[in-house]
Amino acid sequence: LIRRSSAAKPHPLWSLQVMMDEPELVANVHRDFCLAGARVICLNTYSVTRHRLQMGSALPDLPELLKHAGDLARAGIQASGLSGIDIVASLPPLTASYLQQSPLSPEQMKDEYKELMELQRYHVDGFLAETLSSIAEGEAVLLAAQEADTGVHLAFTVQDEDGTRLRSGELLEDALRVCVPLKPLSIILNCSVPEAIDQGLPLLAVATKTFGA
């Protein structure tokens, strides 16, 4: 929705850049989601990680960008005139989406996720780790949440041609075996075609009580 509304040309950090160049657009999108009935909105921070920021230049530092995203979400809620709407922070893949294997070590991933949580924990109502492609990413974010003493909703993306496997090729069943004991608030499937979601959801239903897509 932001991409369709913005005059900016797409590039690897376009969603971040539009937040700086057209902040009112991002706030208005949050407002419109609230007016459409959303009771939880997610910060526009999918590309705000230390490794992704290395692709850009003349950008504010990580804490400032995260704060700016939170301010825009709150402005959108205020503009809607509604109350009782929660804000969650995005915990994305740290380097790029849909990678079979992250170039970062498990310890590096855990530390960076923990930093993102600690920088935002007092400004949001929760955390959504989204579009994770591998067991290592899921385990890292959940271990980081334990160290940060906070909860996190965990969302995996699965292969379009086989919804029982993560984008990494690993079995979704194996991912659940590793991640469910680490007590995510919920486990979700996202950023996959509907047919793949249909294949994966029964595995979630067996493994955990709180799941969705």
Indicate residue ranges for each PLM-predicted region.
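Domain-level signal for soluble alpha/beta catalytic cores
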Residues: L1-A213
